[in-house]
Amino acid sequence: MSLLTEVETYVLSIIPSGPLKAEIAQRLEDVFAGKNTDLEALMEWLKTRPILSPLTKGILGFVFTLTVPSERGLQRRRFVQNALNGNGDPNNMDRAVKLYKKLKREITFHGAKEVALSYSTGALASCMGLIYNRMGTVTTEGAFGLVCATCEQIADSQHRSHRQMATTTNPLIRHENRMVLASTTAKAMEQMAGSSEQAAEAMEVANQARQMVQAMRTIGTHPNSSAGLRDNLLENLQAYQKRMGVQMQRFK
């Protein structure tokens, strides 16, 4: 799974189902594909979204700022700074500084995520705040590792509060991952289609998958329900691949 797919999965797992979730998913896809390069407009849009908690807005603002190229002197946004101040708790700030020093030594996404997971959500948010306020720099991979660790902790607490049966991997994250991968596969099918005879069919299947993912994000579904979506899409994709005589990577 690519780094950006993983980041998208984790970030979306903490956003409540509804039309806004589908909209945010689209914005993230556009940002990661380099299609949305107006950071100022993006942040203004994010600031005025309803429903989202200040921390979720802070995390999204941090991700957008990391990903969208911007002029050096671009002003930092107050709503992101306030969300990433660790509730003003000096203990969170102390821990954030310790974590930041460790993250400086971690250059990989997984290494950074592993280190960050042993800290509290408040300390993780404060550490993001340090980086956001340009008080320190880490690699982009390290910063994304920090983001995903924070989202995993939030999703874990949401999952516990949902009183769902615990499994080895958080079902909310797994569910979101299936939907992100279904979208990615749909995109790949469209690219593969080209001008072949089956192009219309491939586009149709991809379009159906995309609409299904959007509908699931909008109305909200049980974490197990996306397994069926994944299986249907895989079936369609494999049948299409057979005819095209190509192989694509499976996803779970």
From Swiss-Prot:
Gene Ontology BP term (one): viral budding from plasma membrane
Keywords: Host nucleus, Membrane, RNA-binding, Viral matrix protein, Virion
Annotated GO MF terms: RNA binding; structural constituent of virion
Topology versus the membrane: Peripheral membrane protein
GO cellular component, one term: host cell nucleus
Compartment(s) of residence: Virion membrane; Host nucleus
Pfam families: Flu_M1, Flu_M1_C
Keyword match Membrane: yes
Gene3D superfamilies, A to Z: 1.10.10.180, 1.20.91.10
Region ranges (RNP-binding): 165-252
Span of the annotated motif Nuclear localization signal: 101-105
Domain of life per record: Viruses
Start and end residues of each stretch annotated as Membrane-binding: 1-164
Stored InterPro entries: Flu_matrix_M1, Flu_matrix_M1_C, Flu_matrix_M1_N, Flu_matrix_M1_N_sub1, Flu_matrix_M1_N_sub2, INFV_M1
Family affiliation: Belongs to the influenza viruses Matrix protein M1 family.
Function description: Plays critical roles in virus replication, from virus entry and uncoating to assembly and budding of the virus particle. M1 binding to ribonucleocapsids (RNPs) in nucleus seems to inhibit viral transcription. Interaction of viral NEP with M1-RNP is thought to promote nuclear export of the complex, which is targeted to the virion assembly site at the apical plasma membrane in polarized epithelial cells. Interactions with NA and HA may bring M1, a non-raft-associated protein, into lipid rafts. Forms a continuous shell on the inner side of the lipid bilayer in virion, where it binds the RNP.
HAMAP family: INFV_M1
Subunit-structure text: Homodimer and homomultimer. Interacts with NEP. Binds ribonucleocapsid by both interacting with genomic RNA and NP protein. May interact with HA and NA. Cannot bind NP without genomic RNA.
Additional notes on this entry: Most abundant protein in virion. When expressed alone can form virus-like particles in transfected cells.
Protein name, as recorded: Matrix protein 1
